[in-house]
Structures are given as structure tokens and as C-alpha cells.
Amino acid sequence: MKTRSVCFFLVISMLLISCNLWTITGNKMITPSNVVISENRDVSGFNAINFSTLGKINLMQGDQESLNISGPDNVVPEIITEVNNGNLVIRTKENIDINPLGNDNPLTFTIVVKDLTSFKISGAGDVQMEALTTPELTIEMSGAGKIVQNQVSTENLDLSISGLGGIDVSGQATQARIDISGAGSVNAPDLQTQTANVTISGLGSATLWVTDQLTGNISGAGSVSYYGDPQTKTSSTGAGSFKSLGSK
């Protein structure tokens, strides 16, 4: 019995060791090194971004598009960056997974855009967007992460969250649409909007500033808090609630 227990322990140990190299899906697992490199990628002609790996993103508006990636020297080469039909795609190579607990040197993406109308992120990302002026902007977030958008100026703003993500946004938008499924949150008390439509299913929450008209629907235990004195047309089922925070 003792011999059998020792053999079992050895087998389990070998399996655990192998899990550091390969995931249960058969993908190769890379543990980031402690050597940091920086690499400029040749990108141009895009107004949309699709990000599906992990890391920190610093995004700003400027006259010249650019992309810089810094991070572990064994991870940066595994990141694909390509522009397809105006969409900048940033992803990990196929059959590759990155150990998110590898070290204290995360991937960092510094992106300069001339214009941005769509930003989609899936996976785990920490995004910092600086002041942005654009006719319309759609932000779609799935998975876990945080997006901070400072001082956006746009006619139409569309925010969508599925999962545990959070979006903080300030600035001005003529119209805003917010769609949250899961436990995501939108924090926008400093985003002045004329009209807003909010749809929440699950435990999501949103804080807004609306001047003219607010419409919305909550199914589940979600909540919407708003500044301003807009006309309202809202409905909720379950424990959902709409709450006025008074004038701004």
C-alpha cells in the first residue's frame, strides 16, 4: 500500500509539473521571463481595435498611428498584431497561453490612434484611454478587466459589458447606450449625456449623468443611479432599481 501511495504521489507531481508547460486544452503555457524588451510594431490605417490577450493598454489620440509593446522577452514575440479592414487586431498566437501569474512585468501596449470608433476587449486587460474626440465610439468588454476613458467627446457612445468588467468614463456624449449582462459596472457620473438608454440583466450597475431623457430596463438585481432631472421611462423586474441622485 505504501508503494502504491508513493507511485500515486509521483504521478500527480509529474502532472502538476506538466501543467506549467501545457494547458488542459493542449495549448503551450508560457511563464513570462524577468527580461523585459520593447518592440515597435508597424501599424496604420485603423480606427477600430480588437484586443484578445492580456496586459495593460495605454491609448491616446495623436497625428501619427503607432503601437509599442513592452514585456517579457519570451512573451512579446508571441503577440500577433495586424490590421484587417481598418481593425487593429492584437492577440496571442494560436495554441499559446500566457501564465497571468508569471511575474511582475506585465505586457504593456502603448497605442496612438488618429481616430477610434470601436474598441473590443476580451480576456483580461487594464485599459487607460486619454482624451478622445470622435463622432461615435463603441466599447465592448467581455471577461474581466477595467477600462478608464478620460474626457471623451462624441455624438454617440455605446458601452457593452458581459462578465465582470468595469468601465469608467467622463466627458460629453449626445446619446449614450449602456448594455450590461452579468456583474459588470459603468461609472459615468462625470459623463454629461443628453439622452441615455440602459439595459441591465443580472447584477450589473450603472451611474450616469443625464440632462434630457433616460430610458431603461433592468431584469435581475441590477441598479441604475443618475444625476440630472431627465424625463424617465424605465422598468424593472426582480430587485432592480432606478435611483435619482439629484442635480449635478
Kindly label every feature range from the protein language model.
Residues 1-248:
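Intrinsically disordered, low-complexity terminal regions
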